[in-house]
């Protein structure tokens, strides 16, 4: 379980200080599907990045399975990201000249896993997202929804405890959005926690819990 305890984050540009997060507290339970809903500039992506270890908080604490991260070094954050977190972003960030199998396999290259095992794990991840018959295709041969599924497979290939998704449906049409949210529900049913940032009420409604964020504060939840 993750506990976010009164976390604040500020960004400084010269003499200007922007309060991105203001004493945010919440618990993220195991095997939960949570949506963070809010407008642009509300702090939702900053919160996601801090939970994922991509950004550092200024005040408060992020507690991982009962352990404070206040004294975490870079290597601790690296280990946390590599073993606990899978990231899905709105932009697919796929390498265009490589097959989707190779794109997913790349996520395992720094893990010390042998090539044959990497390829097998990448294949299984693509099968899990419904792309088992497309593993030798390149990104430009896929639809937007399919490319986002490749990005999800890449996030799943390390078998993370938590999947963090930042506006994953933002570039998709209505049908592809519904299919992607169906997939997230399936992943969540298998036991993985999903935290999804979105500005779409429709997308957020598919989650088991919705956190409403505005001006850097979580002001309501359903």
Range-by-range predicted roles:
Residues 2-213:
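ABC family nucleotide-binding domain
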Residues 210-222:
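H-loop (His-switch) and adjacent beta-strand-loop-beta switch element
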């Amino acid at each position: 379980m993750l506990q976010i305890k009164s976390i604040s984050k500020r960004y400084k540009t010269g003499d200007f200080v922007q309060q991105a997060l203001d004493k945010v507290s919440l618990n993220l339970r195991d095997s939960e599907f949570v949506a963070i809903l809010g407008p642009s500039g509300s702090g939702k992506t900053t919160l996601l990045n801090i939970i994922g270890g991509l950004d550092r908080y200024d005040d408060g604490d992020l507690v991982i399975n009962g352990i404070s991260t206040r004294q975490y070094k870079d290597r601790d954050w690296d280990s946390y990201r590599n073993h606990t977190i899978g990231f899905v972003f709105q932009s697919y960030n796929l390498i265009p000249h490589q097959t989707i199998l190779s794109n997913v396999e790349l996520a395992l290259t720094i893990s010390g896993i042998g090539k044959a095992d990497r390829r097998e794990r990448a294949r299984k991840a693509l099968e899990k997202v419904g792309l088992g018959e497309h593993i030798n295709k390149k990104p430009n041969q896929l639809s937007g929804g399919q490319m986002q599924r490749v990005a999800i497979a890449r996030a799943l290939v390390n078998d993370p405890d938590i999947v963090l998704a930042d506006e994953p449906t933002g570039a998709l049409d209505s049908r592809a959005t519904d299919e992607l949210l169906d997939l997230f529900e399936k992943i969540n049913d298998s036991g993985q926690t999903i935290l999804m940032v979105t500005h779409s009420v429709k997308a957020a409604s598919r989650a088991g819990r919705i956190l409403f964020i505005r001006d850097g504060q979580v002001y309501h939840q359903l």
